[in-house]
């Protein structure tokens, strides 16, 4: 049998507005993670174009995509990807030591409420605290865009709300552009704008008249 082509995204057209908090909502397999990977320069589309502030990334070299990710994009994933043998501060310094114009690693940890835990190792921290270290690491290089892929997916409700509160705080304090993907419809209420995906397509887009705080979310 021959190879079977699987289309992950179909006719997707999306503009992320500077300074907004965008939630991309969809079930597993809807294409939202693929879209986020393309937006972050981790993958390139087989057709269509991707641009960032007027610069075409569609046919960029690996070196240019690496530079784009390193300078302009902060990533937060469902699993924290922090190094167990390093303290919270040392994990954040992995980024600040190579970034062009980073904030101080201690400042990043203070922004996420871990000023008293910065010398702790991951094994001494809860799941929510480890995710906050991951957020601090992502924002420490002062990215133009923060991309969050199911940041509460491995957390219970109360811990998830705390992590969303940190993301909301970072969004407001740094005037950051945030795109957060989730399968959790309750999280959509904290967004400026919501994109719903199904089977690789955008099926709905709307703007929230008022945004809820993470503490007001129910799921």
Where are the model-predicted features located?
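ABC family nucleotide-binding domain
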Residues: 1-191, 196-197, 202
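Conserved beta-strand-loop-alpha-helix hinge in the C-terminal portion
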Residues: 201-219
């Amino acid at each position: 049998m021959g190879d079977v082509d699987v289309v992950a995204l179909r006719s997707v057209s999306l503009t992320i507005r500077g300074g907004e908090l965008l939630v991309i909502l969809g079930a597993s397999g809807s294409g939202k993670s693929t879209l986020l990977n393309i937006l972050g320069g981790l993958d390139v589309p087989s057709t269509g174009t991707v641009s960032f502030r007027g610069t075409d990334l569609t046919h960029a070299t690996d070196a240019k995509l690496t530079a784009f990710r390193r300078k302009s994009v902060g990533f937060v994933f469902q699993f924290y990807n922090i190094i167990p043998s390093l303290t919270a501060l040392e994990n954040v310094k992995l980024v600040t030591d190579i970034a062009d114009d980073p904030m101080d690693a201690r400042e990043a940890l203070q922004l996420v409420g871990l000023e008293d835990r910065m010398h702790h190792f991951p094994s001494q921290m809860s799941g929510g605290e480890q995710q906050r270290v991951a957020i601090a690491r992502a924002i420490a290089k002062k990215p133009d865009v923060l991309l969050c892929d199911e940041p509460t997916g491995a957390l219970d409700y109360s811990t998830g709300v705390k992590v969303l509160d940190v993301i909301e705080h970072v969004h407001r304090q740094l005037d950051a552009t945030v795109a957060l993907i989730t399968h959790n419809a309750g999280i959509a209420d904290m967004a400026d704008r919501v994109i719903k995906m199904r089977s690789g397509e955008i099926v709905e887009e709307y703007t929230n008249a008022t945004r809820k705080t993470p503490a007001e979310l129910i799921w």
